[in-house]
From Swiss-Prot:
Catalytic reaction equation(s): N(1)-methylguanosine(37) in tRNA(Phe) + pyruvate + S-adenosyl-L-methionine = 4-demethylwyosine(37) in tRNA(Phe) + 5'-deoxyadenosine + L-methionine + CO2 + H2O
EC number(s) from the headed UniProt entry: 4.1.3.44
Organism lineage: Archaea, Methanobacteriati, Methanobacteriota, Thermococci, Thermococcales
Protein name from the UniProt record: S-adenosyl-L-methionine-dependent tRNA 4-demethylwyosine synthase
UniProt entry tagged with the keyword Disulfide bond: no
Superkingdom, taxonomy of origin: Archaea
Domain Radical SAM core: 64-312
Coarse class of the protein's main subcellular location: cytoplasm
């Protein structure tokens, strides 16, 4: 009999599900994911493909200098999450909630197998006449890991070690988390195993909106997020708060968002539109997708409540606006500059 994970204030007990059910794994494969080990996964990013075939790129390339064609998009927790967000493009109706896998795969195994999975997905581009040979060879050897693809990555108990394994291989790393596992961040701080850039996705300005938009699977999710934001403040790494904005749902109260952002005092804030894609189309309508102008106007309203921040850049194809802290060097790299240090 499987035991359920119990998530209590300040503690996570991991027991449970030995493997991903075959029907769930098959659903992901149909969506062009490669399953890695027991619980991880890889999928080629839309912008990686566009970079190879059309020379276009992701907003993270424009904002931070990440090379879209050399990005490995992966997750160590493919089908498990603490939220059921209405805007999620993943097949969360088939997610396994917080019933976590055990035993967990080794971090080094996940990294090596993720690189192999990426190459398996890339092989079809090798003979494509639209793809530059040198660019394909670079894509074959990724240098950046976006740990964010699906599920809540911080549920993986060895996240610090996973980051370290990527860094050993010369990768830069982004983690995108919903902020509900602050104890994982505490461990990573103690171990000094932080990612190159840490994102927290904040998609509600208050607990009422949180309950209706994020539909938490845990009883104290909001309190956990507040703790996570406090831990982010003054971290010795690059930090971002990302707002995924859904028209008619969470695109209100910029002053409340600002209070949350100032708890973390991140280097960057991204105001980004919800995109009407994937499984979210079963829950929302195209009218919930803000225009770039809507996002720009919301960012302008938000920054009025963020002393020490300004609008730095925007990228219309992704409907995203970059807000940056005033003390970040717009030409610099690393923990004091706008751009990633490769």
């Amino acid at each position: 009999m499987m035991e359920m994970i119990t998530i209590k204030p300040g503690k996570i007990t991991v027991q449970a599900n030995p493997n991903m059910p075959k029907e769930v794994a098959e659903l992901f494969r149909k969506q062009h994911y490669e399953i890695v080990g027991r619980h991880s996964g890889v999928k080629l990013c839309h912008w990686l493909k566009k970079s190879l075939t059309e020379g276009r790129f992701c907003y993270k390339q424009k904002f931070y200098g990440i090379h879209s064609h050399r990005c490995l998009q992966m997750t160590p927790v493919l089908a498990w999450c603490t939220h059921n967000c209405i805007f999620c493009w993943r097949p969360m109706e088939n997610f396994l909630g917080t019933e976590l896998p055990q035993p967990w795969d080794d971090p080094a195994f996940i990294v090596e197998e993720s690189i192999k999975a990426q190459r398996k997905l890339l092989i079809g581009y090798k003979g494509n006449p639209k793809v530059d040979k040198k660019k394909f060879e670079e894509a074959w050897n990724p240098t950046h890991a976006a740990i964010s693809l699906s599920g809540e990555p911080m549920l993986y108990p060895y996240m610090g070690d996973l980051v370290e394994e990527f860094h050993k291989r010369g990768f830069t790393t982004f983690i995108v988390t919903n902020g509900t596992i602050p104890e994982r961040l505490e461990e990573m701080i103690k171990e000094d195993k932080l990612p190159t850039q840490l994102y927290v996705s904040i998609t509600a300005p208050d607990i009422e909106t949180y309950n209706s938009v994020n539909i938490p699977m845990i009883p104290d999710g909001w309190e956990r997020i507040l703790r996570f934001l406090e831990l982010m403040r003054d971290l010795p790494t690059r930090t971002v708060v990302r707002l995924t904005l859904v028209k008619g749902e969470n695109m209100h109260s910029p002053e409340k968002y600002a209070k949350l952002i100032l708890k973390a005092r991140p280097m960057f804030v991204e105001a980004k539109a919800y995109m009407f894609v994937g499984y979210s189309r079963n829950r929302l309508t195209i009218n919930n997708m803000p225009s770039h102008q809507d996002i720009r106007e919301f960012a302008e309203a938000l920054v009025k409540h963020l002393p020490g921040y300004h609008i730095e850049d925007e990228y219309e194809p992704s409907r995203v606006v970059l807000i940056m802290r005033d003390d970040v060097d717009p030409q610099g790299t690393g923990v004091e500059g706008r751009f990633i240090k490769h």
